[in-house]
Amino acid sequence: GTDYQYTTRVCYTGKVMPSATFEQDSTQLLMGDVYIVGGMDPKISEEDISVFARSIRALGVDTICGNIYADRSMKDAAPYGEGWCWDDDNAILSALVYKRKDNMIDALLTALANEHVFLDGTSGEKRCPQGAKVAYELDRPLEDVLQPMMKLSNNLYAESMYYQIGLTQGRPATAKKAQAVEEAILKKAGAGNAIHRFADGSGLSLYNYLSAEIEVAFLRYAFKRQETFDALYRALPIAAVDGTIKDRMAGTAAAGNVHAKTGTLSGVSSLAGYLTAPNGHRLAFSIMNQGVMRGIYAKNLQDKLCAAMCR
């Protein structure tokens, strides 16, 4: 639901105790390990990493007499989606993704050094044990990810959402588990018999096979569920207003009316969403253009069709 949150935790084991080296020594030691438990939050920032480091410092610790571990157990180890082009500059699909790479531990080590926390150990990967204490928990509302995912057509955000869906079927989250949820929804939407293939969450995969019929079925399914529709409608780009269609349909009846998501690959251009017809009826639509040498031609056609439906 819309109250879902992405969760990233900083945990630790062992105890904090003073150094016994010198009587006057004020050094506080963590006699244990630190764990960063990933939730595939794609919005983690440099400031968030600094907060993680400060949460360890706030324990009174200036030396970690143990190791720092990355807990990536939230999802499988697949770094890329099935059928992605090898020469694309794709983000790494890690439970601890940071700035599109799997380098959160390195960033944390730098932040700890800035907080004058010394690591007397090494870094690695290990699942956080039950009973570990939580130093800090970062919870990010789903809509904070949904909005830029839809408005800006962010592929990493879409993949992170996909794995959250897969997580509802148990750990570790996988693309196949997310696809099982998609298949179940497709049946409920009345399009289960339509020819299709789901491969990833962003649409980058060359193995995806969808039709306009299926997209409209999903849109109608969402429309009938008020909470889902409200969140989706708020997140969709608005013609001539914002997002990926900010510069499209200006000066037409579609401006400010069409709420729709773009889809773009080499030779493919699509647009799907909602608009309100002159009689007040809300329409769900999907337009797919394939085999186009220049995307602008497809977009111009889509814009004209949307304007016609709004008149």
Predicted features and spans:
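Active-site-proximal beta-strand/loop segments in catalytic clefts of secreted hydrolases
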Residues: 37-40, 70-73, 100, 153, ...
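A small/polar active-site loop signature that marks catalytic segments
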Residues: 99-233
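Short, solvent-exposed secondary-structure boundary motifs
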Residues: 1-3, 187, 261-266
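Active-site-adjacent loops and short helices of periplasmic peptidoglycan-processing enzymes
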Residues: 1-104, 116-147, 152-155, 167-168
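C-terminal soluble interaction/assembly domains
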Residues: 194-311
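Short, well-ordered beta-strand elements
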Residues: 36-38, 144, 148, 159-163, ...
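Short, mixed-charge aromatic SLiMs
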Residues: 14-26, 131, 173, 184-188, ...
